[in-house]
Regions:
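Positively charged, low-complexity terminal tracts
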Residues: 2-158
Length: 158
């Protein structure tokens, strides 16, 4: 039995088109430096992020492929006490997973559209990215772990 050419073409075209659409839907529009940041972050022993508790809750991965293990503690002493901030401490490999989650939510493909936490994820990604770019190798064992502060009520220094 011979299959008409149009039917054969249709059988080949539809699955190919479906695979293409599914591939595009899963894409993000990552910044050009994203892969370099992931590589650099992977080499960090530990990093701390100080941010509002709600911002962490909104952007932390909640299962799926980008699971993040982090220690979260309330900032209760020092000049940033009583501001609703938390210190999120994680290893470099967990920072990689967090950055992947942030990138996926902050830079969705035009096919996916924005997610409910796109703005929050973009804010965190945009704060973490330049800090990772600035990290230099430790010069002594006493050098502190990198600390990234996300609190827009504190004026930037520099």
């Amino acid at each position: 039995m011979r299959i008409p050419r149009t039917l054969l073409a249709l059988r080949l075209f539809v699955p190919g088109a479906l695979v293409t659409v599914l591939a595009l839907v899963g894409c993000t529009q990552s910044p050009a430096e994203h892969d370099d940041r992931l590589t650099k972050a992977a080499g960090l022993a530990r990093v701390s992020i100080l941010c509002p508790k709600d911002l962490w809750e909104e952007t932390k991965p909640t299962g799926g492929i980008n699971e993040v293990k982090a220690t979260v503690s309330k900032v209760s002493t020092g000049p940033r006490a009583d501001r609703g901030l938390v210190r999120v401490s994680m290893t470099g490999t967990n920072l990689v997973a967090y950055l992947k989650e942030l990138d996926s939510n902050a830079h969705p493909s035009s096919w996916n559209g924005e997610k409910k936490n796109t703005a929050a994820s973009r804010r965190v990604y945009d704060a973490i990215a330049p800090e990772i770019d600035r990290i230099k190798a430790a010069t002594s064992p006493e050098d502190p772990a990198p600390e990234i502060v996300i609190d827009d009520t504190i004026p930037e220094q520099g």
